[in-house]
Amino acid sequence: MTDKLIRELLIDVKQKGATRTAKSIENVSDALENAAAASELTNEQLGKMPRTLYSIERAADRAAKSLTKMQASRGMAGITKSIDGIGDKLDYLAIQLIEVTDKLEIGFDGVSRSVKAMGNDVAAATEKVQDRLYDTNRALGGTSKGFNDTAGAAGRASRALGNTSGSARGATRDFAAMAKIGGRLPIMYAALASNVFVLQTAFESLKVGDQLNRLEQFGTIVGTMTGTPVQTLALSLQNATNGAISFEEAMRQASSASAYGFDSEQLEQFGLVARRAAAVLGVDMTDALNRVIKGVSKQEIELLDELGVTIRLNDAYENYVKQLNATSTGIKYTVDSLTTYQKQQAYANEVIAESTRRFGYLDDALKATSWEQFAANANSALRSLQQSAATYLNPVMDTLNTFLYQTKSSQMRVSAMARSASAKTTPAENVTALIENAVGAREDLDTYLKESEERVKKAQELKQQLDDLKAKQAATAPIANALTAGGIGGDESNKLVVQLTNELARQNKEIEERTKTEKVLRQAVQDTGEALLRNGKLAEQLGAKMKYADTAVPGDKGVFEVDPNNLKAVSEIQKNFDFLKKSSSDTANNIRMAASSITNAKKASSDLNSVVKAVEDTSKVTGQSADTLVKNLNLGFSSLDQMKAAQKGLSEYVTAMDKSEQNALEVAKRKDEVYNQTKDKAKAEAAAREVLLRQQQEQLTAAKALLAINPNDPEALKQVAKIETEILNTKAQGFENAKKTKDYTDKILGVDREIALLNDRTMTSTQYRLAQLRLELQLEQEKTELYSKQADGQAKVEQSRRAQAQISREIWEAEKQGTASHVSALMDALEVSQTQRNVTGQSQILTERLSILQQQLELSKGNTEEELKYRNEIYKTSAALEQLKKQRESQMQQQVGSSVGATYTPTTGLIGEDKDFADMQNRMASYDQAISKLSELNSEATAVAQSMGNLTNAMIQFSQGSLDTTSMIASGMQTVASMIQYSTSQQVSAIDQAIAAEQKRDGKSEASKAKLKKLEAEKLKIQQDAAKKQIIIQTAVAVMQAATAVPYPFSIPLMVAAGLAGALALAQASSASGMSSIADSGADTTQYLTLGERQKNVDVSMQASSGELSYLRGDKGIGNANSFVPRAEGGMMYPGVSYQMGEHGTEVVTPMVPMKATPNDQLSDGSKTTSGRPIILNISTMDAASFRDFASNNSTAFRDAVELALNENGTTLKSLGNS
């Protein structure tokens, strides 16, 4: 049809002169021819497929024949041989399938490429034809009617070509169009389609096998978290159905049940319910089990109605509530109070009970039919095969053997291996999983060992029966032969022997399988035990350990041992905790709703009490932290103590709120008791109110404790507010009675107080006046309260208020007057005190006056006039004190400057840059004068002073302040002093060497003695010059250090004292007598000196010192008995430790590195002169005696300093002399 349309269109177009369009149509025809060629190639490839498919068919036939040859009567050997044959055929089948797959892949690739090329060519040609026709139509649209016919034909061609493109995309219609010329092509296509379907089914089977593998992995992961692998649940479910469902379906159902929280025991009950329904109603076992699990978990009664189990939810809930209330926990449950988990359990219990009630009589007869077991086993084998093929890990034969003959033992091994895998990956902190895994492994092993004993016993019985039968045959063999020869009898005994032999062989095979399974189960126990031992605290609580044999070698893991009873007990405790954890949301909800009713409060208290006990028990037996367990419950508590406090609060709340009848009875009894004693109704009511208030206060305390658990609970807030309102109402009843009595006796009580005030003789007039006014104010306030309760007392209330205001004003004026008198008396008391203490110092007088004024200001707060008065006095006194301070500073600066002969201009009154500039001028003038005075003493000192000046000038340029400059200059000068000392030591050492050489050469002649004397004199001069230089430098350093020791100008006296001490030392060093005596070089060297004995007399008229005892003992030191200063014996010095040093005073040295101090008397070993004794250079500064001499020569300066100090304290030397 397509070819015909194309030819007609081509002729029509050529007749009408559309050349380009005709060419496009020819291209379309060429493309279709190419498509036909591609189809022929496809046919050729498909033609090769029947031979391969025929080979597959023959292999399948041979496999089927091998399967038909399997006969149970031939025993296990025949079965094994048949299985071997199946394995060979399956190997060949696998090879043929691979070849088919390769050829199909090649063929389909060619077909795909050809069809794709054909479609592309047709589509391209069609688009080109359509474009050309559109162009032709636009060009010839307005010429003639013939062209209109061309347009119509072009439209039909376009539709025909569209149909051609659609046909090219559909392979079925293309092949159908070619059927007339294809020959065997349709048959080949059918064969190809069927094989493609087979392959697709095979791929789907492999996909299902992979899904099963993932399902088993999921089961292992779930076992890691819950302690019970899904494989174990599936095995329990399969056993409950007597093998009526496959292991695959059991795995699926077990996974679903595990997600809903059902355990293995419940799954067994569900399996029994499904089995009953399947047997009675004739439904499929898998569908029945699926309905039971989903119906119970989702509480969908429609699913179970179809299984003959009809239940009303309300009935199930009511029956479960009755069971809960029968446990005598003190909690009254209702249907509305049941949690989601409890409702699920209620429905599950009712389903099991209803199934047992209706179909329980069939339990003994229930057994899976052979066809059901065969279907389940075949399905399990198929699924196992699919799993094995999906993994590509094991040979095909081993995989088939494993899954075609899968027994209970092999399933147990799978379950045990899954448990071992779960145990190895279970975290040590997951106590639940560790315990459940260990308990499950132990129970599986014990159960299996018990079954194995029964199997062994049965095998022994079979063997004994077979031995007896053989013995019997041996005894009756002659008779049997005779009967057989005569045609009487048969071989029934032989058949029985064969049957028993096969059965015994099967039992032995099963025992062998069980031996393997037992090994795996024991390994599971070992693995779960090792996992449990990873949690040291849990293992310690359980007493679990590894037991090693006496002949154990290094690396032996030992055998896991634990008391099964302990393990089971811990498991139960952990299960209880896990159950509470699952229902923690319900417990939290009960706690939140505790304030809504006393029933909810009781339930919350009971739940929380159970939780506390469970946490304590779990923490005790597992070693887990109680606080961590509490946090895991997610009840809003962070520690066990907090939970206990909440439980105590709930318990007290229940106790306080659940005795309303008892409280009412107690109030009534108290009221009756007091009335019988006093016959006073008011007292009886008051006593009853006291009891009621106590009860209400207890309830309020309990309600607040409950509110502390749930601070934002609206019900608890309402409860607290309600009780507080009741307390206030109860108190208000007492207030009404008290007011009546007070109103009656008010006037009399006021009179009594006035009389008592008049009789008080201890108060002054001012105090009495204030007390009287305060009493009047109090009485007026009471009158106001009294009048306000009267219907016609409003006018009296206003009068009383005005009287209160007037009295308050009078009280304020009286208090102000009394305060003013008291405050003014303070200044009078100060003047008296100063006169008594003979205070004459102006500074002290002003300071004390300022302190009293501040006290007066503090006491006068609230009185504006007095505050202004005392603030003004404080300001004046402070100004006078500051002026006195400035004047005295100026006087001190002038006096100090004149005493030391300094050029100094006072800076009093100057501030800011003016004062800084004046201070700089004073410093420079003092420095110039000091340098000029030092230059008068020695020319070398002048040079040193000039060097110091240059160094100072350089340091000033880089320092940040005058004190920093002074410190840097002092450091530089100390460096110069060290250099001078080193140079002097070198010169003295050279002269000592010259003296030693001269003594060695001659030393006896006059010329030699004269030369030695000259050398000694030269050495003495060098030492004297060096000493003077050192004194000058050290004095300058001391002055600079004194300048930085305390703030200026208080450092001036220290600087002056340092300068004077240096001057005295320089004067002493300038004289020859001031140096240590050196023996004449011409005389014999004196080896020792006799200095006399140490006196034992102590002048008791002088002040005692700590050195007197050391002096009398003969310790080393300096001074006499009254001024003795002990000295150290030398020793090691360590970083960070301070040591006392010095000859004439205490110096503290803190070395930063390890040092050693050597006494002076030990220096002779290392530095001896020619005379054999050390040269000691004594430089005397201002000691006690020198200071006394200095004080005697400069008494005027000291007198002025003392006079100034006394003037600051308000006295004079003259006044002291008069006193």
Swiss-Prot record:
EC number(s) recorded for this UniProt protein: 4.2.2.n1
Residue ranges that the Swiss-Prot or TrEMBL entry lists as coiled coil: 441-519, 838-941, 1003-1032
Source organism superkingdom: Viruses
Gene Ontology CC, one term: virus tail
Molecular function per GO: lyase activity; peptidoglycan muralytic activity
Keyword check for Lyase: yes
Domain text: Probably forms a coiled-coil structure.
Subunit structure: Homotrimer.
UniProt-recorded name of the protein: Tape measure protein pb2 precursor
Protein source organism: Escherichia phage T5
